[in-house]
């Protein structure tokens, strides 16, 4: 799976975290592992321009998704022929997201992870224009984000334990006899 990130926002963000959450969602949603995804991070002026051009709405927004193909909710871009398929583009605005994060009482990284999940779900055909669609999409979004966070916490604790084990083994070598 290829995920390309281009940060043109001027704000330092963890690109590896964005890739991690996108890769997790794509895997959990059974998308073809050869799928390609592009993520672009823009400043508010560029996002406002994109928002007006594509949605005819003034001002910036947090995330926009541009699927390569129209997909049904839960659908996949699997194709019978070999080769990668282009899932689409997710455009994020970290500056706008930072304001939302502050209002919600969490970090920019947490907000961008949420928006990445949201963007991938849009690429897979999910929408929230109608109340029933919103309920389904937001429940799935919450579930996927919680699972990804749990996986990150587990990996962190495993890394910590491995580091403790390594230090303990290093200390025990002092007592080894030749």
UniProtKB/Swiss-Prot annotation:
Cross-referenced Pfam families: YbeY
Amino acids binding Zn(2+): 118, 122, 128
Co-factor: note: Binds 1 zinc ion.
Cofactor(s) of this protein: Zn(2+)
One example GO MF annotation: zinc ion binding
GO CC field: cytoplasm
EC number: 3.1.-.-
PROSITE patterns documented for this protein: UPF0054 (PS01306)
Major localization listed first in the record, in broad terms: cytoplasm
InterPro entries: MetalPrtase_cat_dom_sf_prd (IPR023091), YbeY (IPR002036), YbeY_CS (IPR020549)
S-S bonds: none
Gene Ontology terms describing biological process: rRNA processing
Keywords: Cytoplasm, Endonuclease, Hydrolase, Metal-binding, Nuclease, Ribosome biogenesis, rRNA processing, Zinc
Keyword Cytoplasm: yes
Subcellular location: Cytoplasm
PANTHER family assigned: ENDORIBONUCLEASE YBEY, CHLOROPLASTIC
Family: Belongs to the endoribonuclease YbeY family.
Protein function: Single strand-specific metallo-endoribonuclease involved in late-stage 70S ribosome quality control and in maturation of the 3' terminus of the 16S rRNA.
Name of protein: Endoribonuclease YbeY
Species of the source: Mycolicibacterium gilvum (strain PYR-GCK) (Mycobacterium gilvum (strain PYR-GCK))
The encoding gene: ybeY
